[in-house]
Amino acid sequence: FGAVRCIQAVLPSMRSRQSGCIVNITSAVGLLATPNQIPYSASKWALECLGEALAHEVFRFGVRVVNVEPGVIMTNIFENSAATTRYDKTSPYQPTMRRNGKVFASGFKRAVAPERVAETILEAVTTADYRLRWPVGPDAQGMFDARHQIAAEDWVAMGAELSDEEYNSKFKGYFGIDLSKT
């Protein structure tokens, strides 16, 4: 886990100086796990947990920890992605895959430039007003807000066999995103 090795390398000098800021670049899916992205979501949840626990642990040493949580960013990452080229229409997970595709399509409509992530990092490390979590982009902010409003059991229950209309209605209610328009 590269983040842990990096933190282990810099933390002793930050502690001795009684200052510093560790920046973890996580993801909006580190706040609310998305189906069909389990390994990615799990790795980002782990980094979220690391940041939260470490922030508590090193606060007394004057060291800040921030988790920067981008949503969809305007890059070419999906151009050659296997996920975009392989879509098994006979899969029993097809409804979930289709809906998750709509979530991403919605995110692409509101994607932000990579520079916005850099600006957020700069703000997070220079502001006097400390916050642990820094969502980047409207989709990330929506997931951040929803994570604090939706019970985990309600999110899980959205995996039930709902009609697209029911699912879209619930999704819009929780996240403010109308998937029927994607």
Predicted ranges, named:
Residues 59, 63-108:
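C-terminal beta-strand-loop-alpha-helix "lid" module of Rossmann-like NAD(P)-dependent dehydrogenases
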Residues 32-38:
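Active-site loop immediately N-terminal to the catalytic Tyr-X3-Lys motif
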Residues 7, 43:
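Active-site helix of classical SDR
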Residues 27:
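Residue(s) in the substrate-gating loop at a strand-loop-helix junction
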Residues 1-2, 17-20, 45:
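Conserved internal alpha-helix in NAD(P)-dependent oxidoreductase domains
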Residues 9-18:
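A short helix-coil junction within the Rossmann-fold of NAD(P)-dependent oxidoreductases
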